[in-house]
Amino acid sequence: MTTPELKSLLHVRNLKMSYGGIQALRGVDLDVAHGELIALIGSNGAGKTTLLKVLAGLLQPASGTVHYRGTPLIHHAAHQLVQEGLTLVPEGRGIFARLTVKENLQMGSYCRSDEPSIDRDMQNVYELFPRLFERHKQLAGTLSGGEQQMLALGRALMSRPTLLMLDEPSMGLAPMMVTKIFETIQEISARGVSILLVEQNAKLALEVAQRGYVLENGLITSSDSAAKLLVSPAVRQAYMGS
């Protein structure tokens, strides 16, 4: 019999995390299947970014279990998780402003030694984001916000992720650039990369996802197909203003 943690690519159960005496996560259960695009929505301060940081190995939980590809992940370092195929694009992008676009992309492959494949992957990133190729010698800090988000995504892809976690990819971007970024997210998903998407624009996130979770006050309060969450009166009132 296949156990739940082996069936899912990512299997999270009863995950708890505290900052001092404040409980940020109060027993989160979440699953991501192979090839799924999952939306995680919730209000500011709900615990979404904390959850992603725990999953990425940047924070240690108080208790609970995380299985990735059937293997327990608690106490793994962040660089080990990147090597295993779990990559986070953080809120605020986290690019290296004083490095060039190309150097930023090369940093994404720091855990790899397969030079020919790295070169091919960089060409694939340039095909996905032609603007990055046009600016590959330019310092990353001089790029526009949208171009920096492209670079953050491209750098993450250079690690060859199996699960890509995105924290607020539309934040601070113009509407046209948001459309471009989300089209690219869908294209990455279509290539077979599993995606866990945290996004302030709940409607947009659910429109591109297969399933969704609602996180409030450190707890998952609802989970369903994205289509059903999109028409849920409670979800629409709380997160879409209608």
What are the functions of these language-model segments?
Residues 20, 38, 76, 101-120, ...:
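ABC-type ATPase nucleotide-binding domains, specifically the catalytic core motifs of the NBD
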Residues 41-43:
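The feature captures the beta-strand-to-loop junction immediately N-terminal to the Walker
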Residues 56:
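Helix-to-loop junction immediately C-terminal to a conserved catalytic motif
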Residues 64-72, 84, 117-122:
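Conserved ABC transporter NBD signature motif
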Residues 139-143, 147:
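Conserved ABC ATPase signature
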Residues 156-157:
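ABC ATPase C-loop
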Residues 160:
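Conserved catalytic motifs of ABC-family nucleotide-binding domains
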